[in-house]
Amino acid sequence: MNENAPTHKSSHKVKTHTPVSGYHIEDLRTYPTEKLLEIANKLKVENPQEFKRQDLMFEILKTQVTQGGYILFTGILEIMPDGYGFLRGFDGSFSDGHNDTYVSPSQIRRFALRNGDIVTGQVRSPKDQEKYYALLKIEAINYLPSDEIKNRPLFDNLTPLFPDEQIKLEYEPTKVTGRMLDLFSPVGKGQRALIVAPPRTGKTELMKELAQGITSNHPEVELIILLVDERPEEVTDMQRSVKGQVFSSTFDLPANNHIRIAELVLERAKRRVEMGKDVVVLLDSITRLARAYNAVTPSSGKVLSGGVDANALHRPKRFFGAARNIEEGGSLTIIATALIETGSRMDEVIFEEFKGTGNSEIVLARNIADRRIYPAFDILKSGTRKDNILLGKDRLTKVWVLRNVMQQMDDIEALSFVYSKMQQTKDNEEFLNLMNEK
């Protein structure tokens, strides 16, 4: 576990079923240091200005308990191999620290808790020789009373189907990225999509556009952005640009931390899908996640080209393969970036291994980006399997007629043609009608 992982402010709102007095850990995490000092002085904490921020929160909570208050904590459950678990805070990196709450094996068995469950409960402060808070009473699991989730299904037992409901990405007439994707590479609930991206082709901006389109058109969808091995400034930019929850493990952290964060995010998404929710995970990038797995996988003696161990890609494939539309209700959509043309043979091997696993591909082209055309979207190479289910017969026919016309053009001409026509229309319906008249 990495105790030096960066923390981020959480906008997560705690939902409880019983009123509990006092300050909550989640609230304290969001307060500026000046506010924490004000609270500490109010509670008569000795010399609060001498404490670091994390330690000051700890002192406030400890003092609150000694004065008869309660602590209510909501966190994501991470179960350890030995059977006990911890509730991690919504700080964007699930970093472990003194503010985490210990959950005993007996509580996990009694309430049939699973990795990724969001647990709300009353906790007590650490006793002598104890390092963590301890969970006393569970108030809610995944924001529901505990008795309501006892019969929930297991994710792996649910029936996967082809995506049959489109996620609309078009949200503004001038934002043509979502409009193009809606027609030429539509994304449905339960899609397993790859964004194939050479360096500097605008994949980060594309991810922001996807997030904006999803949150604008589908408030019922829970959006999670997972950034693996990214630069810290990219994480901050993403947090400020999108409305979904951003979880990250930056490049200065070890590969084990990348894997831990990714798997906990996936388990959280699965728990929501088990309850019939629609969840979208935007992953940047599947290539770096696979690299992390390759770094920690014990050598099997079978090494593929580029230094990839033959067994290293099984777990990232399981991550990507979790995306599915569920017959019983709910869906898990994963849209992941795959890096190509990086100069690394390992990245090429990873891409080839994932190439056939998705059911949708969004291809970005370096030669288009070099012309300063964004999005650098290769319309001719991008597409979605079974797009007839998502588009409907009438729209599909119009799109295929348009594709046939563009087959006579190169990729830059095709994109420029569509881009210019979309700029003249306010939505895709008007665009298709305009194309139909020509």
Curated annotation (Swiss-Prot):
SMART domains: AAA, CSP, Rho_N. Disulfide bonds: none annotated. Residues 70-145 form the Rho RNA-BD domain. The keyword Metal-binding does not apply. InterPro entries: AAA+_ATPase, ATPase_F1/V1/A1_a/bsu_nucl-bd, CSD, NA-bd_OB-fold, P-loop_NTPase, Rho-like_N, Rho_factor_ATP-bd, Rho_N_sf. ATP binds at G188, K189, G190, Q191, R192, A193, R200, T201, G202, K203, T204, E205, R231. It comes from the Bacteria. Keywords: ATP-binding, Helicase, Hydrolase, Nucleotide-binding, RNA-binding, Transcription, Transcription regulation, Transcription termination. Pfam families: ATP-synt_ab, Rho_N, Rho_RNA_bind. The keyword Nucleotide-binding applies. Facilitates transcription termination by a mechanism that involves Rho binding to the nascent RNA, activation of Rho's RNA-dependent ATPase activity, and release of the mRNA from the DNA template. Homohexamer. The homohexamer assembles into an open ring structure. Belongs to the Rho family. HAMAP family: Rho. This is Transcription termination factor Rho. It comes from Helicobacter pylori (strain J99 / ATCC 700824) (Campylobacter pylori J99). The lineage of its organism: Bacteria, Pseudomonadati, Campylobacterota, Epsilonproteobacteria, Campylobacterales. The gene is rho.
